[in-house]
Amino acid sequence: MQKVRPGLRQLLDAVGDVPAMVLGRRADVLAGNRMAHLLFTDFTALPAAERNLTRWIILDPSAGALFRDWKTVAAEAVGALRMDVGRHPNDPQTNQLVGELAVHSEHFRQWWAGHRVASRSAGTVRLHHPIVGDLELNFETLSLPDDPDQMLRVYSAKAGSPSSDALTLLSFGEAAAVPEPEPARRDDS
């Protein structure tokens, strides 16, 4: 099981004004700050086996409603998963995830059959959040040299933009309603 270093967890909390998360193999969500949970979903509230960004994007209807370019985002997530399969072809958790997605999503089956391998370390996502409306956020995905299977993904908006204002509103408007995310339990797998 992958672990997030305490210093990295501290960094996530320190960049509390912007959504940030640590992704592991298969795009497992290993940790996220409060803004990531407000913007996307509270992955810590999900069963351990469901704390996966690709799984959430493909199978959760709230993700389909959130991403304005859902098909593009989902197809890119499938391409990144295929890249992970290439790096770790005999990983049982990866094979289980691919099987689950194939059983439950026709889109996934089509994209998987296309054999597209891709990974973007930076880009833009367009969202329609149920509380703050439309956002356009840039993301950067940074590799972590101490653990090549972990990445830090940070989402930001251009300063002074309506998206920046929406993130501020989301942060302040929901501050009392959403508790700080709990770290993953040691017995998670």
What is the meaning of each model-derived region?
Residues 2-189:
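Hydrophobic protein-protein interaction segments
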